[in-house]
């Protein structure tokens, strides 16, 4: 592999790494994203996304591609082991222009962010690449 010089090295192509790489690239900050796995993970670990995260997706210019893949404005009922409700979450406001609770498929979000990173920003993303040390 040739030597690469960058301002920021991001280790991990999960949602956080992909968001960070996109945001830095949107401000013309050179970054390289590495991931030890062969691709993004195809099984969801996160299932809910809030309004402020949707604003970040909006700032990256891909909100319209993402909104049709989510279920908006859902609530939750929390039930104790003995079957009694102990909490109800039913958000109703759209303080930042989006509903506060939305369900999504994490692999869809990761695919969208990765495609945006590669096509819009022409960023360097390396899979099957492990971070070994820093000195």
Go through each PLM region and give its residues.
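Beta1/beta-strand and adjacent pyrophosphate-binding region of the FAD-binding site
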Residues: 2-16
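Short hydrophobic core segments
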Residues: 9-11, 105, 131
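Glycine-rich FAD pyrophosphate-binding loop
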Residues: 11, 25-45
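Short alpha-helical segment within the catalytic ATP-binding CA
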Residues: 18-19, 51
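Active-site-adjacent segment of FAD-dependent monooxygenases/related oxidoreductases
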Residues: 43-118, 126
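A conserved short coil-to-beta-strand element within the FAD-binding core of flavoproteins
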Residues: 127-135
């Amino acid at each position: 592999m040739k030597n690469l010089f960058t301002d920021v090295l991001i280790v991990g192509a999960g949602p956080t790494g992909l968001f960070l790489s996109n945001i830095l690239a949107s401000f013309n900050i050179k970054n390289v994203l590495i991931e030890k796995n062969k691709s993004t993970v195809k099984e969801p670990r996160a299932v809910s996304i809030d309004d402020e995260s949707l604003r970040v997706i909006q700032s990256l210019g891909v909100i319209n591609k993402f909104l049709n893949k989510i279920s908006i404005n859902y609530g939750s009922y929390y039930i104790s082991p003995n079957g009694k409700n102990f909490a109800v979450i039913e958000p109703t406001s759209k303080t930042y222009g989006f509903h506060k609770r939305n369900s999504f498929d994490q692999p869809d979000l990761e695919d969208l962010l990765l495609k945006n990173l590669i096509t819009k920003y022409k960023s360097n993303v390396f899979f099957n690449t492990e971070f070994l040390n820093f000195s």
